[in-house]
């Protein structure tokens, strides 16, 4: 404010000096010009508030503000369009069987059967099967050198082996050392041995686990049936834990490390 008053004072002084006559007066004429000096007045009072101006230009984009809180969950939208069909999935596990359905209607009657011709054909086939069975049995006995019953097949192996090796050989063929558990089986084995012209063979009886407690090669215990020869078993030299059969059908206990022929036994059900 003081600066403005000082400026006004200077301007007034200059204006006053300009009005004084100069040292060389000039004649007044028609061409004379008058000089006017405008001196600013004092600052007036504040005017009335003007009208609202036009909107200014948009300012610069400000910095990104902080992330606001999550808003409320919106309403469920409408169902969208169906997407593309996806790839075929892997095959699932087999489900449980369903309930048995109701019986179906009876079928139409079949054609009349010519039973007499069929019976005749079946009878002829039965005869052929019986003949083939007999021929096969003969081939087994004559060529293969085996003997058989309704449930067993016996094979005489002409290879000298110790008892343990003989048992392994029979097992490798799918059987075991022969086990005469009754009179019929013992008689068949003895006849087989005699017809082959052999004096003795290993059979599937031993007391390797417990002295004097003889068992068959399938580990079943001996019961009432036996064919021990007179004075047997005697466990001579305290080493006779295995059993042989002689051509007469009798049994002797012998040393297991002795080598001789042996007889194998096979179940027909497992053949």
From Swiss-Prot:
Residues that, per the record, bind Ca(2+) 3: 211, 238, 241
Highest rank taxon of the organism: Eukaryota
Coiled coil: 114-148
Expression sites (tissue/organ): Ubiquitous. Detected in adrenal gland, kidney, liver, ovaries and testis (at protein level).
One protein family per Pfam: Collagen
Gene Ontology CC terms: collagen trimer; external side of plasma membrane; extracellular region; extracellular space; serine-type endopeptidase complex
Annotated localization: Secreted
Residues binding a carbohydrate, per UniProt: 200, 240, 244, 252-254
Gene Ontology annotations of biological process type: antimicrobial humoral response; cell surface pattern recognition receptor signaling pathway; complement activation; complement activation, lectin pathway; developmental process; execution phase of apoptosis; positive regulation of opsonization; proteolysis
Skewed-composition ranges (Basic and acidic residues): 45-54, 66-75
Domain C-type lectin stretches: 149-265
Residues engaged in binding Ca(2+) 1: 207, 211, 235, 240-241
Annotated region described as Disordered, given as residue ranges: 44-113
Binding-site positions, Ca(2+) 2: 232, 234, 240, 252-253
UniProt cross-references to InterPro entries, sorted A to Z: C-type_lectin-like (IPR001304), C-type_lectin-like/link_sf (IPR016186), C-type_lectin_CS (IPR018378), Ca-dependent_lectin (IPR051077), Collagen (IPR008160), Collectin_CTLD (IPR033990), CTDL_fold (IPR016187)
GO molecular function, one term: calcium-dependent carbohydrate binding
Disulfide bonds: 170-264, 242-256
Disease: 3MC syndrome 2: A form of 3MC syndrome, an autosomal recessive disorder characterized by facial dysmorphism, craniosynostosis, learning disability, and genital, limb and vesicorenal anomalies. Facial features include hypertelorism, blepharophimosis, blepharoptosis and highly arched eyebrows, cleft lip and/or palate. The term 3MC syndrome includes Carnevale, Mingarelli, Malpuech, and Michels syndromes.
Purpose of the protein: Lectin that plays a role in innate immunity, apoptosis and embryogenesis. Calcium-dependent lectin that binds self and non-self glycoproteins presenting high mannose oligosaccharides with at least one terminal alpha-1,2-linked mannose epitope. Primarily recognizes the terminal disaccharide of the glycan. Also recognizes a subset of fucosylated glycans and lipopolysaccharides. Plays a role in innate immunity through its ability to bind non-self sugars presented by microorganisms and to activate the complement through the recruitment of MAPS1.
PANTHER family assigned: COLLECTIN-11 (PTHR24024:SF14), PULMONARY SURFACTANT-ASSOCIATED PROTEIN A (PTHR24024)
Family that this chain belongs to: Belongs to the COLEC10/COLEC11 family.
Protein name: Collectin-11
Gene (name only): COLEC11
């Amino acid at each position: 404010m003081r600066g403005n008053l000082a400026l006004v004072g200077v301007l007034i002084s200059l204006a006053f000096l300009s009005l004084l006559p100069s040292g060389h007066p000039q004649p007044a004429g028609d061409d004379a010009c008058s000089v006017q000096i405008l001196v600013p007045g004092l600052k007036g009072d504040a005017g009335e508030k003007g009208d609202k101006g036009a909107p200014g230009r948009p300012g610069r984009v400000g910095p990104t503000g902080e992330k606001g809180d999550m808003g409320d969950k919106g309403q469920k939208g409408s169902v969208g369009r169906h997407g593309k069909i996806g790839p075929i999935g892997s095959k699932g596990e087999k489900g449980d069987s369903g309930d048995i359905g109701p019986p179906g209607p009876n079928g139409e009657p079949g054609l009349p059967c010519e039973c007499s011709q069929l019976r005749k054909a079946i009878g002829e086939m039965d005869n052929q099967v019986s003949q083939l069975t007999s021929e096969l049995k003969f081939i087994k006995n004559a060529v293969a050198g085996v003997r058989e019953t309704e449930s067993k097949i016996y094979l005489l192996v002409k290879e000298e082996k110790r008892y343990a090796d003989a048992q392994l050989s029979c097992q490798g063929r799918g059987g075991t050392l022969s086990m005469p558990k009754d009179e019929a089986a013992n008689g068949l084995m003895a006849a087989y041995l005699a017809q082959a012209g052999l004096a003795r063979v290993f059979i599937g009886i031993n007391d390797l686990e417990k002295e004097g407690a003889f068992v068959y090669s399938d580990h079943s215990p001996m019961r009432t049936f036996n064919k021990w020869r007179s004075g047997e078993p005697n466990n001579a030299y305290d080493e006779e834990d295995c059993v042989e059969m002689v051509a007469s059908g009798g049994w002797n206990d012998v040393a297991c490390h002795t080598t001789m022929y042996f007889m194998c036994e096979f179940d027909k059900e497992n053949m």
